Regions:
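Glycine-rich, flexible N-terminal cofactor/catalytic loop recognition
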Residues: 1-48
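Short polar/charged helix/loop
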Residues: 16-17, 35-40, 47-94, 137
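PTP/DSP superfamily signal
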Residues: 82-96, 103-105, 113, 117-263, ...
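Short functional micro-motifs and their immediate structural scaffolds
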Residues: 106, 225, 292, 306-309
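Short cysteine-rich clusters marking metal-coordination/redox-active sites
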Residues: 217-220, 283-287, 300-303
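Cys/His-rich Zn2+-binding "zinc-finger" mini-domains, especially FYVE domains
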Residues: 274-290
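Conserved tryptophan-centered aromatic signature that marks the ligand-binding surface of SH3
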Residues: 293-300
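Cys/His-rich, Zn2+-coordinating zinc-finger modules
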Residues: 305-323
Length: 323
């Protein structure tokens, strides 16, 4: 067990066992990041009601939070970071915190690295280097490092309104689909036709700048997406040959191909997506006009970029207007 900051420790399963056996009384909060909780590490339940699916169990001298994480690249850690931060902050106010996984190398290192990034405004490399100066074996797996870089890109916070997060969320939904897991409707973005702006500051900003777009069905004018739903992608430079009339190669001039579609996050009006197919058409929820298509396995944009998963709306089927 190594102390990373005052009162904040990183460790492995053996360190956790010592804490649970009351051999290490100074630890008051135990954050366990394990795929499965070993029977001999089980502790009594309590009246404390944690978030759904989260095991949070106090002992007389100890409060414990268990997150069921696997040490694999595809494990989603971003969605639990705020919960980890809250737990660590509370623990440091009143005592000492041990963050542990099986070996004290990857999962625990990822959480403490993220905590240092947020609390000290450190970039990924700097936060990890600082952690490794206290615990040389700390080394998050590549998937965790990618998510920590996303966390850095969002300004050391989990910003669920940012396009960075929405891309990540869509990719994770695609992974769940590929694993055969059911995806709840609540996992999809709200129907923009039913959403209203409630933040006066945001209303003022939008009326001031007037740069945001609404996308409407060309046939019935129903709102089907807004700027917040759009997932941008880097163009691969899709190009097509242009025949020359003069001498020389007929194919030595090319023209860049623009994106003819808009790719969006999955939304609650997309009933065809909720029916469980791998791919299908996206139709207007009001008039049933065809708007585009979806494919959990991905689709190539006209610009050449491969988008996975793909929820594609054709520009020719929509009208775009500023608001």
């Amino acid at each position: 067990m190594k102390e990373v900051r005052k009162g904040l420790f990183i460790g492995d399963a053996k360190d956790a066992e010592a804490v649970l056996s009351s051999a290490t009384q100074k630890i008051t909060h135990l954050l366990s990041l394990l795929a499965h909780l070993p029977p001999h590490q089980s502790v009594p339940s309590s009246q404390h009601l944690p978030p759904e699916g989260v095991q949070w169990q106090p002992l007389p001298h100890l409060t414990r939070l268990w997150l069921s994480w696997k040490d694999i690249d595809d494990q989603n850690i971003i969605d639990s970071l705020d919960l980890c931060f809250h737990f660590i902050d509370n623990g440091l106010r009143t005592g000492h915190v041990l963050v542990h996984c099986l070996a004290g190398v990857s999962r625990s290192a990822a959480v403490i690295t993220a905590y240092l990034m947020r609390s000290e405004c450190l970039f990924v490399e700097d936060a990890l280097s600082s952690l490794q100066s206290k615990s040389a074996s700390a080394r998050p797996n590549d998937g965790f490092l990618d998510q920590l870089r996303l966390f850095e890109s969002m300004g050391f916070k989990v910003d669920k309104k940012s396009s960075i997060y929405k891309k990540f969320h869509s990719e994770k939904l695609g992974q769940l689909y590929n694993l055969g897991e059911s995806i709840k409707n609540s996992s999809f973005a709200e129907d923009p036709a039913l959403c209203t702006l409630t933040d006066p500051y945001e209303q003022h900003q939008q009326s001031d700048l007037c740069t945001h777009l609404l996308y409407r069905c060309k046939k019935c004018r129903r709102i089907i997406a807004c700027h917040k739903n759009v997932l941008t992608h880097e163009q691969e430079g899709g190009r097509i040959p242009i025949e020359k009339k003069d001498k020389g190669s007929l194919w030595n001039e090319v023209r860049t191909v623009d994106c003819t579609s808009v790719f969006v996050e999955p939304m609650q009006w997309m009933t065809a997506v909720q029916e469980g197919g791998v791919l299908g058409r996206l139709s207007c929820a009001s008039c049933n006009a065809r708007l585009g298509s979806f494919n959990w396995a991905g689709t190539q944009c006209s610009c050449g970029t491969w988008v996975v998963p793909a929820f594609q709306l054709h520009k020719s089927r929509m009208d775009a207007s500023k608001f």
